[in-house]
């Protein structure tokens, strides 16, 4: 027993010295309930994807990779994340390495262009230095890098067209992520990298698909999301959008390999009400009787949403209070009411009661 007490005393002194030298929180006991905090997130902008992540969105203090084929919806998801971060009062930055950001489309998705930080870097080193500086500032909540494939090293840009530059981009990403990863965790920012798919030559077995930029991002990313474009969404004979399937291929904060399906309308982004309606029907929150759809409110009142899915979706668009109540019930069912969102809702409710 005396030896145990002595060990405990020595350990406490060591922990105290570490905290004095490196700051509070630099070391902690994992099982201490006062130290373990729920995962803070920035919503994805899609209820289905929020559910698939297992925590309700992109985890703060982490690196996220969104990858997929061309025109699969990667940038759309990134812009929706920016809009959500701004709604929460956060600061967002967009590193446009592709030099292809459409401000009109971003605005249609809900992005506040007046407060959005944007950079169009000349080369990969500049882009990643800007990311590092923004993360270290501690005041930026979300940084999107679009995309890894466009982060061309300076040596490649300055070299001749036919020069062999083996592994330059992979080394650049590896070096940069070593610096950024530690800073991200302390700043509580989310850094989203969008990435493209390439084909490995000569693969006989397994998938020939891989992502650009080497292996570093795969290791440092807390969450990796694979985006694939599905069947077209039609209005009559006209194609107005696409079904998008998302698979969480890596997740360090919740069980991985969950999938989600969402609906992107060209020029408008994710159709939230259509997505909400489908989830609510599948979860039994919205009832179907013949071709009619009904919802029973928390007060016990049965509300008719309309005949047919299109009318029901339009009803949800026209009645955001009911849509919001349905969404909260779904989030509560999956335990996804984040601390920040819940606090905002309580503040709005209390301010409304005070006003009345």
Curated annotation (Swiss-Prot):
SUPFAM superfamilies named in the record: P-loop containing nucleoside triphosphate hydrolases, RecA protein, C-terminal domain
Biological process according to GO: DNA recombination; DNA repair; SOS response
Coiled coil: none
Gene3D superfamilies for this protein: P-loop containing nucleotide triphosphate hydrolases (3.40.50.300)
Gene Ontology, cellular component aspect: cytoplasm
GO molecular function: ATP binding; ATP hydrolysis activity; ATP-dependent DNA damage sensor activity; damaged DNA binding; single-stranded DNA binding
Record-linked InterPro entries: AAA+_ATPase (IPR003593), DNA_recomb/repair_RecA (IPR013765), DNA_recomb/repair_RecA_CS (IPR020584), P-loop_NTPase (IPR027417), RecA-like_C (IPR049261), RecA-like_N (IPR049428), RecA_ATP-bd (IPR020588), RecA_C_sf (IPR023400)
Family stated for the protein in its record: Belongs to the RecA family.
Function text: Can catalyze the hydrolysis of ATP in the presence of single-stranded DNA, the ATP-dependent uptake of single-stranded DNA by duplex DNA, and the ATP-dependent hybridization of homologous single-stranded DNAs. It interacts with LexA causing its activation and leading to its autocatalytic cleavage.
Protein name (database record): Protein RecA
Species of the source: Thermotoga maritima (strain ATCC 43589 / DSM 3109 / JCM 10099 / NBRC 100826 / MSB8)
């Amino acid at each position: 027993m005396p030896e145990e007490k002595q060990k405990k005393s020595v350990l406490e002194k060591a922990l105290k010295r570490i905290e004095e030298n490196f700051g509070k929180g630099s070391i902690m006991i994992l099982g201490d309930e006062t130290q373990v905090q729920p995962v803070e997130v920035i919503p994805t902008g899609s209820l289905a994807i929020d559910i698939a992540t297992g925590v309700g969105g992109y985890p703060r203090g982490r690196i996220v990779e969104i990858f997929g084929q061309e025109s699969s919806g990667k940038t759309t998801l990134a812009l929706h994340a920016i809009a959500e971060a701004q709604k929460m009062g956060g600061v967002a930055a967009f590193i446009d390495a592709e030099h292809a950001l459409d401000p009109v489309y971003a605005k249609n998705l809900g992005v506040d262009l007046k407060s959005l930080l944007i950079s169009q870097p000349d080369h990969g080193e500049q882009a990643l230095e800007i990311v590092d500086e923004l993360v270290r500032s501690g005041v930026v909540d979300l940084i999107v890098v679009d995309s890894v494939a466009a982060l061309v090293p300076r040596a490649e840009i300055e070299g001749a067209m036919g020069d062999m530059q083996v592994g330059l981009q992979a080394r650049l990403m590896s070096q940069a992520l070593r610096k950024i990863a530690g800073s991200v965790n302390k700043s509580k920012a989310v850094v989203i990298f969008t990435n493209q798919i390439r084909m490995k030559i000569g693969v006989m077995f397994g998938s020939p698909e891989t992502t650009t930029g080497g292996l570093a991002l795969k290791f440092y990313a807390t969450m990796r999301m694979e985006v694939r474009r599905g069947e077209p969404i039609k209005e009559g004979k006209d194609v107005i959008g696409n079904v998008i399937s998302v698979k969480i291929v890596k997740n360090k904060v919740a069980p991985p390999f969950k999938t989600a399906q969402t609906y992107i309308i060209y020029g408008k982004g994710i159709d939230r009400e259509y997505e909400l309606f489908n989830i609510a029907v599948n979860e039994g929150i919205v009832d179907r009787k013949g071709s009619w759809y009904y919802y029973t409110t928390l007060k016990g009142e049965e509300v008719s949403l309309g005949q047919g899915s299109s009318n029901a979706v339009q009803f949800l668009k026209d009645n955001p209070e009911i849509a919001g109540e349905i969404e909260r019930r779904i989030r509560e069912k999956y335990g996804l009411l984040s601390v920040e969102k819940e606090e905002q809702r309580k503040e709005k409710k209390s301010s409304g009661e005070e006003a009345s």
